Amino acid sequence: MKKIKVCIVDDNRELVGLLEEYIDAQDDMEVIGVAHNGQECLELVEQLEPDVMVLDIIMPHIDGLAVLERMRQMNKPMPNVIMLTAFGQEDVTKKAVELGASYFILKPFDMEYLASHIRQVSGKTTGFVRKSSSSFKTQEPKTKNLDASITSIIHEIGVPAHIKGYLYLREAISMVYNDIELLGSITKVLYPDIAKKYNTTASRVERAIR
C-alpha cells in the first residue's frame, strides 16, 4: 500500500515532534520532512513533493499565507494543505482558501482528528474548508496570538504577503507594541534594529515599508 507522504511545518518544535511520532505510527502515512519556518517549508515542497502539508499560519520569516502564495507560483504539484491556527479570523481563513488551503484545524486539537483529515484531503482536490477544535492541548504563547492579530490586520489592509516590506512591517508593529517609545525614534532605533535582524540596511527597511 502506497503511504501518504506528509510534511509538517510549525515553529513549535515540541508539537512537530509529537505530530511526527503520531503520523509515522500510522500504517498508511509517513512524515517525509519537517520544517520550522516558511523558507524551509518551500524548500521541502521543491525537493520532496509531499501529498499533504500540515502548515501553521504564524511562523517566522515567511508566514503560512505567504507560503501558500509562493507555492502557487512554483513549477511543482501543489500539496493538499491543512492549516493549523490558534485563531479563527474569517478574513484570514477566506484568504487561505483562495490561495489553495484544503482544510483548517484550530489549536488545540486531537491528533486522531488530524490523521483522519490527512487521509481525507489526500484523495481530494483543494477548495473546501472546515474548522475544528478538539482535545489535543498545546498552549500557544501570547506572542503567537499577537502575531496572528498583526497578520490579520496587514492582510486586511491589502499588503501582499510576498513583498519584503510585509515582513519588515510585521516586525515593526510587533516591536512598537512591546515598546511604544520606539515611535519616537523610528529612523534612529526601529529601522536599524529591524535591519540588523534581517541582515540589511535601515534605509532599505524604510524604503520597503514605505
From Swiss-Prot:
SMART domains from the entry? REC (SM00448)
**Entry keyword Phosphoprotein:** yes
So where does this one cross the membrane? none
InterPro entries annotated for this entry? CheY-like_superfamily, Sig_transdc_resp-reg_C-effctor, Sig_transdc_resp-reg_receiver, Spo0A_C, Spore_0_A, ST_Response_Regulator, WH-like_DNA-bd_sf
List residues binding Ca(2+).
10-11, 56
Domain of life (superkingdom): Bacteria
Q: Where in the cell is it found?
A: Cytoplasm
Any matching Pfam family: Spo0A_C
Q: Does the keyword DNA damage apply?
A: no
Needed co-factor(s): Ca(2+)
A GO CC term attached to the entry = cytoplasm
Q: Which residues bind DNA?
A: 192-210
For this UniProt record, give its keywords in alphabetical order, as a comma-separated list.
Answer: Activator, Calcium, Cytoplasm, DNA-binding, Metal-binding, Phosphoprotein, Repressor, Sporulation, Transcription, Transcription regulation, Two-component regulatory system
Q: Name one GO molecular function term.
A: calcium ion binding
PTM-bearing positions, type 4-aspartylphosphate: 56
Q: Name one GO biological process term.
A: regulation of sporulation resulting in formation of a cellular spore
Q: How does the record describe the protein's post-translational processing?
A: Phosphorylated by KinA and KinB.
Q: What does the record's cofactor remark say about binding?
A: Binds 1 Ca(2+) ion per subunit.
Q: Where is the Response regulatory domain?
A: 5-122
| PANTHER family linked | STAGE 0 SPORULATION PROTEIN A, TWO-COMPONENT RESPONSE REGULATOR
Instruction: Quote the function comment for this protein.
Output: May play the central regulatory role in sporulation. It may be an element of the effector pathway responsible for the activation of sporulation genes in response to nutritional stress. Spo0A may act in concert with Spo0H (a sigma factor) to control the expression of some genes that are critical to the sporulation process. Repressor of abrB, activator of the spoIIa operon. Binds the DNA sequence 5'-TGNCGAA-3' (0A box).
Name-wise, this protein is Stage 0 sporulation protein A
Q: Which organism is it from?
A: Niallia circulans (Bacillus circulans)
